[in-house]
Regions:
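Active-site/ligand-binding-proximal alpha/beta "capping" segment
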Residues: 59-60, 64, 140-190
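Glycine-rich phosphate-binding active-site loops on the catalytic face of alpha/beta enzymes
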Residues: 83-108, 163-165, 193-226
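Catalytic cores of alpha/beta
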Residues: 58-60, 65-92, 176-211
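Short catalytic helix/loop segments, enriched in acidic residues and glycine
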Residues: 19-36
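Conserved anion-binding
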Residues: 8-22, 89-167
Length: 226
């Protein structure tokens, strides 16, 4: 399944390269809402909130009312998750909140699942140089993606793996890594990071892995009708 991505920063849709350099910027929200309306799921990320530089909550609420969204970025508490679901999000994405003092926070994961239901939770694994990155990808931990999946999979409905090293480059995601992750969990697995062609989507589909695509859609390299 192809999941279009909407990344928000400063009240606009943006696309970043490897989470740092801004490559594209749009404010034609209505056009993208219409274009994405046929998809069963859209990913909505508040980059400002993820980086601790404000938020785009009002805009997120507008999108979530009109599109079936899983929403993430800066959700640090159970209350944050509950409030985002109340705005209309189908699911919420938790990432940095799952790491505490350099280790996976199983207690927080369990508390969140008890509060909103594991099926409403997507646990984000943002990987850079083989290690999980947190706080808007600015802080690198010693935890691997496989370790995070093993520790936390009983408390979520899906995992979202982002390969930061290839994010925004449109050069493909390493499929060997994806295969390892697929073998490690029975949960829904969603991946992101440089996916650029319909052929890649087909390969991932064959592995029962869903794909988040941003840059390739916004540049026109990947046509949504395919």
């Amino acid at each position: 399944m192809l999941i279009p991505s909407i990344d928000l920063m400063g009240g606009r849709i943006v696309q970043l390269v490897q989470g740092e350099r801004k490559a594209l910027e749009f404010d034609n929200f209505e056009e993208w809402i219409v274009r994405f309306s046929a998809f069963p799921l859209v990913q909505l990320i508040d980059l400002d909130a993820a980086m601790g530089k404000g938020n785009n909550r009002t805009l997120i609420g507008d999108f979530a009312k009109r599109l079936p969204c899983q929403v993430g970025g800066g959700l640090r508490s159970v209350r944050d998750a509950e409030e985002m679901l109340a705005t209309g999000a189908r699911r919420v994405i938790l990432g940095s909140a799952l790491i505490r003092n350099g280790a996976t926070d199983r207690a927080f994961a369990e508390t969140a699942a008890s509060a909103v239901g594991a099926d409403k939770l997507v646990f984000a694994i943002d990987s850079k140089q083989g290690r999980v990155a947190i706080r808007g990808w600015r802080e690198l931990t010693s935890i691997t993606a496989l370790e995070m999946i093993t520790a936390l999979q009983q408390w979520c409905g899906a995992f979202l793996y982002t390969h930061i090293d290839s994010e925004g480059l449109m050069q493909g995601i390493p499929l060997d890594t994806v295969r390892q992750l697929r073998q490690s969990t029975h949960k829904q697995l969603i991946v992101a990071g440089g996916i650029a062609t319909a052929e890649e989507i087909a390969e991932l589909d064959a592995m029962k892995v869903d794909a988040v695509v941003g840059m390739a859609i916004y540049t026109g390299r990947m046509k949504l009708g395919r």
